[in-house]
C-alpha cells in the first residue's frame, strides 16, 4: 500500500483546510464529499472543523481504485475528496460554488507582516529557584513529604489504565522490579516488524519543571531539554543521536510586551541548549491560549527526546543487588546556573560507554525530588534498601540537580569506573532507607508515595480476601487429534477494535503455523455478507481458530466480546466452527477479548456454540472498575488441554494482562464443577505460587483466581493473559 502513496498528512486542528491544503500547491477540494460525523455542517465548518483519526493521502489517478479496494479490505471508509491541479490555488467547493479560491503565493506569505514590542524580565537572583531549596531539618518528614509531593508521587493507578504491552515489543514496562514499583523514566520499545527480528529500539523521554519555568522560562527550557536527554542517557541511549520535539503552552499574549517576553525567553533558552548540545528539535506543537479569566498557565516548554539504540545496551532503573554501590554523576554549571554543554556531552558519552561495557547496573536521572526521589524509586521495584553516606549533605537530599544521574555499580567496579562520580551510598538487603541516625522503612516510604493520588486513580478496591485451596488436576490422558498436519492452518478473525492480530499471528508463525487473518467488514450489507462467506471458507480450511484480543466495537453493545459473538452465531459461520471441532478435531483459542467472545458463544465452558443461561460463567468488569495493564503471575493447574502440552503442571509463568472486563464470575457450583473436570486451566497466583484473591496479583478479582478455562475436552481454551505478547528483550525490567 505504501508504495502507491505519494504523500500523506494526518487530520487535526484546522481539519480539511490544513490536512489537505498542505499536500500540494494546487488543489480543488469538494467539501460535499467529505465524510461527516453528523449532518448540518456548512462549508466553513466542513473546511476548518478539527477532525481526528483521519488521514489525507495523495495517489496517482490510475491507483485510485486500487487504493479504495485496499481500504475496503481493511473495513476503512475512503473517498476521493480533492484533486491536485497545476494552477497553484487552493479552491474549496461547497454545493456547486467556490467558497474559497486563494492563490498559493498569498497563502505562503503567512499573512500580513506583524510586529510587537517584547520585554524579557531577567529572573530574580534573590528568588533563584535552585537556591530556594532549603536544607531540611527533619529528615524523615522531608523524605516522606518529598515522596508524597504531586510532582513525585506514584501515578500507577493512572498508568495502568493504558495498554503498555501491545505490539509484543515493549522493552521496559512502565513499572519495573519484582514488585513492579520502580517507574521507568524512558519509554523503550523495539521497532515493529511483521517479519523477522530486530534489536533496534526507540527511546522516548521528557523533561519539564513548571516551577523552574515560572521563575525563568529561559532556564526552564534549558533544563527541560537537559532532563529529557539525561533520562535517555540513564537508559543507555547515545545522546548524540537524540532528536527533540517541543510542546509549548503559554498564556494569552495580547499586546503586553512582558507577556510576550515569556515565550521569547523560553524559545531563546531552547535555542541555546539545542546549539550547545547539537540536538535539533524537528517537531512540536504550540498554543498561546492558556488564559481563563485571570488564571494563566505557567510558561510551558516540555521537551520530548527521541533516540534509537539496541536493546542489548538498555539499563533499567530498579536496584539490582544488595552490596552494590550508589554514586552520583554531576554535570558542570556556570555562574548563571546554565549547564556547561561541553561537559554534559562529555559526561553522557562516558556513561554510554560504561553502560555498553556492562559497568552500570542501574541508573536514574535526578528530578524534582532530588536524591530522595531517585534512590527511593530505584529501591521500590525490588524492595531493596539504601544506606546513604554521611558525606551527603542535607540539602543535597532535596536539591533539584537536573542533569545529574544516580548510578548503581558493583563495589569491585567503583575504582576503575572511569567516570567522575561521588559515592553517595550502598544498596542493602534490608528494605529500609537510612541516613545518619534516621531510618525510614519501605512500608512508610511506599505509603507516602502511593497515598497522594490513590483516591483519584485507585490501585485497590478493597475486595474481601479469602483463602483459595484448589490444587492441581493431573489428567491421565490428553485429547490428541487424529488428523496429523505438518503445518496447521490458523484462522484469526479481525473485527473493528481488534488490536492483537499482528502479535497473535507472529506467535503462531514462530511456532510453525500457517496463519490467515481476515477483517470483518461491516460498513455495508454486502460487506457483511462477503465477510460471512470469507470467514466460513477460512474456518473450513483451517485446523485452529484464534480469537485475538482488543476492544471489538469499543466493547459495545452491552459488554466486551458481544459483537464477535453475534457475528459467529451466524448460521454459516457457527456450522463451520462446530465442524472444525467435532469432525476435524480442531482447536480454538481466545485471549482477552477473544476469551470474552468464547464465553459468550458458549465454546467455553460447554465446548459448543449455545445460548448463555442465567447461571452461565461470565466475564465482567474488573473489581477496581477500570482497565488494568501490568504483568501477572499465572499458574498452570491442569494438563488436560492440548494447548498446555508444553507447559509444566504447577508451573508459574509471568505474562502481561490488559483489560477492563476480565473478572471471571461463576456460581460456587460451577466453579467446583470446572475444577473437578480439569477445565480450570490457569489461576492468578502470588510470588509463592499460591492462588489468591489479593488484587495485587489477581488484578481483576476473578472468582477462585481463575485466569483461563477450557471446554470439557480441553480443545477450546480461553484466557485473559496475553501469552502471545512474548519475545526477546520484552519486559526486561
Model-inferred region functions:
Residues 1-554, 567-578, 700, 704, ...:
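Glycine/proline-enriched, intrinsically flexible loops and inter-domain linkers
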Residues 5, 231, 360, 587-588, ...:
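Residue-level marker of motif borders
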Residues 62-63, 86, 333, 412, ...:
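Short acidic/polar capping segments at secondary-structure boundaries
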Residues 69, 504-505, 557-560, 601-603, ...:
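Short amphipathic alpha-helical segments
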Residues 255, 335-337, 557-566, 682-683, ...:
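Short, basic, glycine/proline-bearing loop/turn elements
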Residues 424, 529-530, 535, 578-579, ...:
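Amide-donor transfer/coupling interface in amidating biosynthetic enzymes
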Residues 548, 590-591, 719-721:
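Active-site neighborhood of phospho(di)ester-bond hydrolases with catalytic His/Asp-centered motifs
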Residues 552-640:
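Cysteine-nucleophile active-site neighborhood
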Amino acid at each position: 500500500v505504501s508504495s502507491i502513496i505519494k504523500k500523506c498528512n494526518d487530520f487535526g486542528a484546522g481539519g480539511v483546510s490544513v490536512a489537505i491544503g498542505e499536500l500540494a500547491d494546487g488543489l480543488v477540494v469538494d467539501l460535499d464529499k467529505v465524510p461527516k460525523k453528523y449532518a448540518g455542517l456548512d462549508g466553513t465548518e466542513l473546511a476548518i472543523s478539527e477532525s481526528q483519526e483521519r488521514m489525507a493521502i495523495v495517489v496517482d489517478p490510475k491507483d485510485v481504485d486500487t487504493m479504495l479496494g485496499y481500504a475496503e479490505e481493511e473495513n476503512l471508509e475512503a473517498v476521493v475528496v480533492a484533486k491536485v491541479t497545476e494552477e497553484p490555488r487552493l479552491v474549496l467547493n461547497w454545493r456547486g460554488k467556490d467558497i474559497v479560491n486563494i492563490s498559493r503565493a498569498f497563502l505562503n506569505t503567512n499573512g500580513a507582516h506583524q510586529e510587537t514590542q517584547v520585554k524579557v524580565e531577567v529572573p530574580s537572583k534573590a528568588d533563584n529557584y535552585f537556591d530556594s531549596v532549603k536544607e531540611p531539618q527533619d529528615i524523615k518528614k522531608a523524605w516522606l513529604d518529598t515522596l508524597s509531593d504531586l510532582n513525585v508521587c506514584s501515578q500507577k493507578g493512572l498508568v495502568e489504565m493504558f495498554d503498555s504491552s501491545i505490539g509484543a515489543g515493549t522493552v521496559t514496562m512502565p513499572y519495573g522490579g519484582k514488585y513492579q514499583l520502580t517507574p521507568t523514566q524512558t519509554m523503550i520499545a523495539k521497532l515493529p516488524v511483521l517479519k523477522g527480528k530486530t534489536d533496534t529500539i526507540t527511546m522516548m523521554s521528557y523533561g519539564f519543571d513548571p516551577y523552574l519555568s515560572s521563575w525563568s522560562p529561559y532556564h526552564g527550557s534549558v533544563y527541560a531539554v537537559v532532563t529529557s536527554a539525561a533520562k535517555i542517557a540513564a537508559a543507555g541511549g547515545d545522546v548524540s543521536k537524540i532528536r527533540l520535539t517541543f510542546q509549548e503552552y503559554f498564556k494569552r499574549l495580547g499586546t503586553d510586551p512582558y507577556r510576550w517576553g515569556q515565550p521569547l525567553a523560553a524559545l531563546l533558552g531552547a535555542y541555546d541548549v539545542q546549539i550547545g548540545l547539537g540536538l535539533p528539535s524537528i517537531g512540536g506543537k504550540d498554543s498561546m491560549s492558556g488564559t481563563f479569566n485571570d488564571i494563566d498557565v505557567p510558561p510551558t516548554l516540555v521537551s520530548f527526546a527521541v533516540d534509537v539504540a539496541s536493546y542489548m545496551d538498555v539499563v533499567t532503573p530498579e536496584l539490582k543487588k544488595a552490596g552494590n554501590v550508589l554514586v552520583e554523576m554531576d554535570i558542570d554549571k556556570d555562574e548563571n546556573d546554565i549547564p556547561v554543554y561541553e561537559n554534559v556531552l562529555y559526561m553522557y558519552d562516558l556513561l554510554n560507554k560504561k553502560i555498553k561495557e556492562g559497568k552500570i547496573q542501574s541508573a536514574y536521572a535526578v528530578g524534582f525530588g532530588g536524591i530522595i526521589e531517585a534512590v527511593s524509586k530505584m529501591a521500590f521495584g525490588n524492595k531493596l534498601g539504601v544506606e546513604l553516606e554521611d558525606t551527603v549533605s542535607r540539602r543535597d537530599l532535596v536539591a533539584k540537580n537536573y542533569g545529574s544521574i544516580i548510578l548503581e555499580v558493583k563495589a569491585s567496579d567503583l575504582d576503575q569506573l572511569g567516570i567522575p562520580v561521588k559515592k553517595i551510598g550502598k544498596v542493602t538487603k534490608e528494605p529500609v532507607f537510612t541516613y545518619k541516625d534516621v531510618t525510614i522503612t519501605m512500608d512508610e516510604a511506599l505509603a507516602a508515595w502511593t497515598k497522594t493520588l490513590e483516591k483519584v486513580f485507585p490501585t485497590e478496591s478493597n475486595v474481601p480476601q479469602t483463602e483459595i485451596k484448589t490444587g492441581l488436576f493431573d489428567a491421565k490422558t490428553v485429547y490428541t487429534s487424529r488428523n496429523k498436519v505438518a503445518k496447521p492452518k490458523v484462522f484469526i478473525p479481525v473485527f473493528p477494535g481488534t488490536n492483537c492480530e499482528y502479535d497473535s499471528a507472529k506467535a503462531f508463525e514462530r511456532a510453525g503455523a500457517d496463519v490467515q487473518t481476515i477483517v470483518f467488514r461491516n460498513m455495508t450489507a454486502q460487506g457483511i455478507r462477503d465477510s460471512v462467506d470469507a470467514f466460513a471458507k477460512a474456518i473450513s480450511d483451517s485446523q485452529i481458530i484464534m480469537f485475538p484480543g482488543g476492544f471489538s466495537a469499543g466493547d459495545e453493545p452491552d459488554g466486551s466480546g458481544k459483537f464477535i459473538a453475534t457475528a459467529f452465531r451466524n448460521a454459516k459461520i457457527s456450522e463451520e466452527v462446530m465442524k472444525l471441532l467435532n469432525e476435524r478435531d480442531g482447536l480454538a483459542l481466545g485471549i482477552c477479548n477473544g476469551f470474552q467472545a468464547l464465553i459468550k458463544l458458549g465454546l467455553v465452558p460447554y465446548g459448543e456454540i449455545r445460548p448463555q443461561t442465567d447461571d452461565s460463567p461470565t466475564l465482567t468488569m474488573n473489581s477496581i472498575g477500570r482497565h488494568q495493564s501490568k504483568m501477572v503471575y499465572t499458574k498452570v493447574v491442569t494438563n488436560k488441554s492440548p494447548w498446555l502440552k508444553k507447559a509444566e503442571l504447577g508451573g508459574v509463568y509471568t505474562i502481561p494482562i490488559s483489560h477492563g472486563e476480565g473478572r471471571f464470575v461463576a456460581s460456587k457450583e460451577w466453579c467446583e464443577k470446572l475444577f473437578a473436570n480439569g477445565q480450570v486451566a490457569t489461576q492468578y497466583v502470588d510470588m509463592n505460587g499460591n492462588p489468591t484473591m489479593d488484587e495485587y496479583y489477581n488484578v481483576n478479582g476473578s472468582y477462585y483466581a481463575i485466569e483461563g478455562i477450557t471446554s470439557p475436552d480441553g480443545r477450546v481454551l480461553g484466557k485473559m493473559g496475553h501469552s502471545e505478547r512474548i519475545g526477546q528483550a520484552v519486559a526486561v525490567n
